[in-house]
Amino acid sequence: CCMALCSRYHCLPCC
């Protein structure tokens, strides 16, 4: 993937 939006609980792929 290009990028990832990450928090303490989860990482959501952002493509």
Curated annotation (Swiss-Prot):
Superkingdom to which the source organism belongs: Eukaryota
GO cellular component, as recorded: extracellular region
Keyword Disulfide bond: yes
Keywords noted in UniProt: Amidation, Disulfide bond, Secreted, Toxin
Keyword Disulfide bond: yes
Signal peptide positions on this chain: none
Coiled-coil ranges from the UniProt annotation: none
Tissue: Expressed by the venom duct.
Positions of post-translational Cysteine amide modification: C15
Main location: secreted
Family named by the database record: Belongs to the conotoxin M superfamily.
Protein's name in the database: Conotoxin reg3g
Organism of this sequence: Conus regius (Crown cone)
